[in-house]
């Protein structure tokens, strides 16, 4: 007898025509209730960047995102090699 597949979470629907937002800079801030991540794109040699997207989430959601990113980056590095961090990154 086979077991029915367990649900893996909500069905994710991507709206038709949705454009991706490229970001090479993120700014993170928080309040007691929320974590705010601003994603921006900055060009080489520029001193300012325009925020392309702002994501506000609960601290729990941020921790779950951190866990998912950690797992996915580990898989990425296992497949493609270690990602080198620049010496001036924070």
Tell where the protein language model's regions lie, with residue ranges.
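Positively charged, low-complexity terminal tracts
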Residues: 1-90
């Amino acid at each position: 007898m086979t077991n029915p597949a367990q649900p893996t979470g909500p069905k994710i629907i991507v709206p038709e025509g949705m454009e991706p937002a490229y970001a090479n800079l993120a700014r993170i801030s928080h309040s007691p209730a929320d974590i705010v991540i601003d994603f921006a794109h900055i060009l080489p040699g520029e001193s300012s960047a325009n925020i392309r997207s702002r994501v506000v989430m609960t601290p729990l959601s941020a921790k779950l995102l951190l866990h998912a990113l950690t797992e996915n980056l580990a898989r990425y590095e296992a497949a493609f090699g270690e990602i080198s961090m620049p010496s001036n990154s924070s």
